[in-house]
A protein has these predicted regions:
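N-terminal secretory signal peptides that target proteins for export/translocation
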Residues: 1-12
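Bacterial N-terminal signal peptides
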Residues: 19-31
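Sec-dependent signal peptide cleavage junction
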Residues: 28-44
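N-terminal "mature-domain start" segment
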Residues: 40-76
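Extracytoplasmic/secreted proteins, especially bacterial periplasmic and envelope-associated proteins
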Residues: 60, 111, 115-119, 184-191
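Extracellular/lumenal ectodomain signal focusing on beta-strand-rich modules
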Residues: 64, 131, 145, 194-195
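Surface-exposed amphipathic alpha-helical segments
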Residues: 65-67, 169-200
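Conserved polar/disulfide-associated segments of primarily extracytoplasmic proteins
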Residues: 70-166, 170-172, 177-179
Length: 200
């Protein structure tokens, strides 16, 4: 028969074992987050700055990503620059464009976002809107954010579009990737978006 001292000793060991198990489990659950934070920190040390005074934009991007300056115009919008990841055969990209809305005096952010969604429906096959809001932030300004999918040449793409108004311009960052790559590059895209500035 166990005496009180023996029971107390067993209980203490049991409590210590359970406590140790909780600590170990907590550490293991935090490991993926910790590794992600290390990856982001390493990536942040290898960022280059892209600045274009003509368009009044500035953004940081990973040094191993490709930068393509475009300057092509489609209607009232100008494609300023595109950033591409280094992965071979990747279809992911971050495109920055500036839309001149001087002919649309008085248009609100919500109206612009709705018009943009309407245009996308007309332009893309199998367009499906996942979410849309006008309470996001880009470069310190109120912004709209739309997430949607569409099909192009039998490939389904997922897109994230964020746009903010300043004066007679709307500054748009559009991230596009195949469904198999979208989540892979999303943290990097979010990091780039956070560095975006309007300089004029």
């Amino acid at each position: 028969m166990l005496n009180r001292v023996g029971v107390k000793s067993i209980m203490n060991k049991l409590v210590l074992s359970i406590s140790a198990l909780i600590v170990i489990t907590s550490c293991l659950s935090l490991a993926p987050t910790f590794h992600k934070q290390i990856a982001f920190a390493q990536q942040a040390t290898n960022l280059l700055t892209y600045e274009n005074s003509s368009y009044g934009i500035k953004i940081q991007y990973p040094s191993h990503w490709e930068k393509q300056e475009n300057g092509t115009k489609q209607g009232s919008a100008t494609d300023a620059v595109t950033f591409l990841p280094p992965t071979i055969n990747s279809n992911a990209s971050l495109d920055i464009s500036i839309d001149d809305i001087s002919d649309e005096k008085g248009i609100t952010l919500a109206q612009y976002a709705n018009n943009s969604i309407g245009d996308l429906k007309q332009s893309f096959k199998d367009f499906k809107l996942i979410s849309s809001n006008t309470n996001s932030v880009l470069a310190g300004l109120s912004a709209y954010k739309s997430i949607y999918t569409h099909t192009d040449e039998n490939t389904t793409f997922k897109d994230l579009e964020v746009g903010a108004m300043k004066g007679d311009r709307v500054y748009i960052l559009a991230y596009e990737a195949g469904l198999n790559e979208y989540d892979k590059y999303l943290p990097t895209i979010q990091q780039l978006t956070n560095t975006f500035q309007i300089t004029n």
